[in-house]
C-alpha cells in the first residue's frame, strides 16, 4: 500500500488572492517573490519525504508436527489447508487422505502462540467428511469412482458450515477410465455434505485433452470479507487454456472463479498467470509442476496467492507468496481458451520467495490470517502437506504481515 506523507510550512500553504496579484506590477511581484523565498529559507526545515511502504512478510517462527502423530485413531498428515475461527480461537485443517489410511477428514485444533512464537498445537477433534446420505467417502481401492481428494477447507461462520474442495479424478489409462468431476461442497458441523456449488461445464473432467488436468483443479478456496462470496482457483491450466508451466516460459494461465454464497452460482472468472517451474528436474525429462496451492482473500479485491513449484529429483518445493489484485481484471467466463488473449489479467506482486528464508520449506498448501499481533499487525499461518511421506514434514510457518492495509 503506497502512502504519501507530505508536510509543508505555513508559508508554502498560503493562498494569495488572484485579484490582489492582478493589481501588482512586475516590480512588486518580483519583490514579493524575493520576500517569499527568503522567508521560506529562514523557516524551519520542510519535510517533503514521500513514504513508499510495500507489504512485507516477516517470518516469526516455524513449528513441526512430528511424523506419524496419531489423534483419535487417525494418522495426522496430508494437511492441505488451514482456516482460523476468531470467535473460538481455533483452527480447522483438512487432510488430503483419500480414505486410504483413515476416512477422509478434517481436524479442529488449538495453536498456542506466545511472544510471537508457536508454543504448541493441540488437536481437539477429528471429524469425518461424509456424503449426502451420511455415509463415509470410500477409498480408491473400494470405489475409485467415488473416492474424494480433499484439498481446501474454509469455515463459514454465518451458518456454522464448512466449504471444502474435492479435486476429483482423471485416470484415462485405467482399465476403465475414471472421471470424477471436481466439486466444492458445503458440509455441516458433522462433516456431512448438504449442498454444493454449481461448477461451470468447462471444469468438468473429459477423457480427451479438454477441461482440467489430473490433480490440477480446485486446490484453493477463500471467502471474502463479507462472507457472501467464495473464491476458488485452479491449480493448473485447463487443456484449452494452454500448456502447463514450463522451465522458462511464463505463459501458463489458471482461472480464478467467484461464486455467490447464497445462490451457489458462479459470478465471474479471472485469468491469473502462474510463474515458470523454478528448478530443472533430474533427469531433465522427469515430472515438474508449478501451480496455485492456496488463496486467501485480503480485502479490497486483493488475494494472497501461494504458488508452489516442484521438480522430480530436487528439494521438496519452491514456494512464492504473491499479493494479487483483480480490481480491473476482465471477466473471462465467456472465453473458451485463454491462449487467444484480449483480456486484462489479475495483477500480482511478489511478497516473499520462501527459498530466501534460508530454512527448509516443505510442500506449503494452506494459509490463513491468524490473531492480531500486539503491535496491531496481522499474523499469517501457513501449513505444509507431508503427503504422509517420512522424507517430508508437516510445518506451521508463522509470519507477521507488515505495512498492510486491509
Regions from the language model: what does each represent?
Residues 1, 18-53:
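Bacterial Sec-dependent N-terminal signal peptides
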Residues 8, 35-38, 148:
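Generic signature of intrinsically disordered, low-complexity, basic-rich segments
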Residues 13, 21-23, 35, 89, ...:
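Short linear sequence elements within intrinsically disordered, low-complexity coil regions
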Residues 42-406:
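Sequence/structural signature of beta-propeller domains
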Residues 6-9, 31, 260:
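Alpha-helical interaction segments
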